[in-house]
């Protein structure tokens, strides 16, 4: 008798996705981040669900409801800090996952890659709205500054901002709708993840060599299930170390002050995982220009397949482009640092140089390096 997992309509899908899936025999730990992102999403949905049971999305009680969760709810502090730091782990895994995709040329899987870019935007939107919910100073002013950027859109900008706010400033209506969207978006993300995997399983996984691995496949289970479990254990160790020993290390002290529209914090900045984009936004001394640069800094990922000039897929055997890739990685760290600094000399100049470098490396230098490497390796035909 054939195993039920191969016959049952529902179990068959699970079997073909996680058990009998043919996987390349040589995928490294860089391929662990997909499953880690899945675990992060599950953690965020579960902790978020329990937080929503005690949270109130009203400007007069939102801040105190979060305090109540931390002080009075059984293990409320644990749930709250797992959710807050879980978001940080989510973004660390996201950035590494995208970086892996860029390094090994996974963007040649066009559908999978484009769904991934949409997922990145969706997760960023969710995280932004979640940061507004505790209704601290940085929640309020972050929401005010970022939503205000939409007013740079010609003609419809101001109307659009007031429509999103539900009034003439960030207030009760804004908080309520942000809570509603913050609750629903993770489920939309989960649906998109299924589509992401659906497209991935049409082609099969990429691998570090960038070569076709059809001739050398192994079953996903037990090889990669056990490997993924190791990754999950390490992820949970890092997350719980953050939660139990340094719960506030990635947060902003200003968010422990209740929101006050009459008192602006000295330095308004988003959570650490948005700082690189915030630095690019601030580096352009024009509102609309800054907003466009901000959007393009992420949207540029969608045009990576068009910038592929090399005859090879990944960067494994391409030392020139490899060097540029790691300079780009360092450049992103510089942008992250600058995003958290005040707008004054020399930070303004450093931010502008890092922003120019970011776009130059991706749009000009890497494609040129690809062509040079083709010639050096005599891949001219």
Curated annotation (Swiss-Prot):
Its main location: mitochondrion. GO terms for cellular component: mitochondrial inner membrane; respiratory chain complex III. One of its GO terms (biological process) is mitochondrial electron transport, ubiquinol to cytochrome c. It is found in: Mitochondrion inner membrane. Pfam families: Cytochrom_B_C, Cytochrome_B. InterPro entries: Cyt_b/b6_C, Cyt_b/b6_C_sf, Cyt_b/b6_N, Cytb/b6-like_sf, Cytochrome_b, Cytochrome_b_C_euk/bac, Cytochrome_b_N_euk/bac, Di-haem_cyt_TM. PROSITE patterns: CYTB_CTER, CYTB_NTER. Heme b b566 binds at residues 97, 196. Keywords: Electron transport, Heme, Iron, Membrane, Metal-binding, Mitochondrion, Mitochondrion inner membrane, Respiratory chain, Transmembrane, Transmembrane helix, Transport, Ubiquinone. Heme b b562 binds at residues 83, 182. Its cofactor is heme b. The chain crosses the membrane at residues 33-53, 77-98, 113-133, 178-198, 226-246, 288-308, 320-340, 347-367. One of its GO terms (molecular function) is ubiquinol-cytochrome-c reductase activity. A ubiquinone binds at residue 201. It is a multi-pass membrane protein. Binds 2 heme b groups non-covalently. Gene3D superfamilies: Cytochrome Bc1 Complex, Chain C (1.20.810.10). Heme 1 (or BL or b562) is low-potential and absorbs at about 562 nm, and heme 2 (or BH or b566) is high-potential and absorbs at about 566 nm. Belongs to the cytochrome b family. The cytochrome bc1 complex contains 11 subunits: 3 respiratory subunits (MT-CYB, CYC1 and UQCRFS1), 2 core proteins (UQCRC1 and UQCRC2) and 6 low-molecular weight proteins (UQCRH/QCR6, UQCRB/QCR7, UQCRQ/QCR8, UQCR10/QCR9, UQCR11/QCR10 and a cleavage product of UQCRFS1). This cytochrome bc1 complex then forms a dimer. Component of the ubiquinol-cytochrome c reductase complex (complex III or cytochrome b-c1 complex) that is part of the mitochondrial respiratory chain. The b-c1 complex mediates electron transfer from ubiquinol to cytochrome c. Contributes to the generation of a proton gradient across the mitochondrial membrane that is then used for ATP synthesis. This is Cytochrome b. It comes from Reithrodontomys mexicanus (Mexican harvest mouse).
